[in-house]
């Protein structure tokens, strides 16, 4: 009798622990687009600030996502969950003259809801459909990887800046 109760207790313990999930949710499920400098300018000597307009109808209201970045070769930009097109304002201040140049970058994308587990927060992945820019300080921007998730290592965009003649 004692042997049966030990077996029953052991079986109950195995079933109880077997029912628990061991799924680890990602800690950082915010999705960022990675931008890498390419072309003649491989490291940013000037100062870069990037902002996102809060409201498309109001030019004076924006959110700064990168403030005075310098001496870098790459950056990460957050992507919106609901908009089909994200707009970024790149303000580049020349380090020798202080002259500021602002370019606008439009990223057209498809939003894809991503579900891992009921225990995890929802995430939104994206497929980049197109990118365009003004050409004041930015020469061009190219799509390098069109799938944006939260564990990408390959840059999504290659950013070509115009060569400065100081």
Give names to the regions the model predicted.
Residues 1-32:
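Bacterial Sec-dependent N-terminal signal peptides
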Residues 21-82:
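Start-of-domain marker
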Residues 20-27, 74, 78-166:
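Extracytoplasmic cysteine-anchoring/structural motifs
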Residues 4, 43-50, 64-66, 126, ...:
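Hydrophobic transmembrane signal anchors and adjacent membrane-proximal interface regions, especially
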Residues 1-2, 53, 108:
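Short, intrinsically disordered low-complexity segments
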């Amino acid at each position: 009798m004692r042997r049966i109760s030990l077996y029953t207790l052991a079986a109950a313990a195995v079933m109880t622990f077997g029912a628990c999930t061991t799924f680890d949710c990602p800690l950082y499920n915010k999705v960022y687009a990675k931008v890498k400098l390419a072309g003649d300018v491989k490291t940013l000597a000037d100062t870069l600030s990037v902002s996102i307009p809060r409201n498309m109808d109001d030019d004076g209201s924006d959110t700064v996502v990168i403030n005075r970045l310098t001496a870098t070769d790459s950056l990460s930009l957050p992507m919106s969950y609901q908009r089909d097109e994200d707009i970024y304002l790149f303000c580049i201040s020349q380090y020798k003259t202080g002259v500021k140049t602002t370019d606008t970058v439009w990223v057209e994308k498809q939003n894809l809801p991503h579900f891992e587990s009921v225990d995890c927060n929802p995430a939104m992945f994206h497929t980049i459909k197109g990118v365009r820019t003004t050409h004041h300080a930015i020469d061009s921007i190219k799509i390098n990887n069109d799938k944006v998730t939260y564990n990408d290592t390959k840059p999504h965009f290659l950013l070509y800046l115009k060569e400065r003649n100081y």
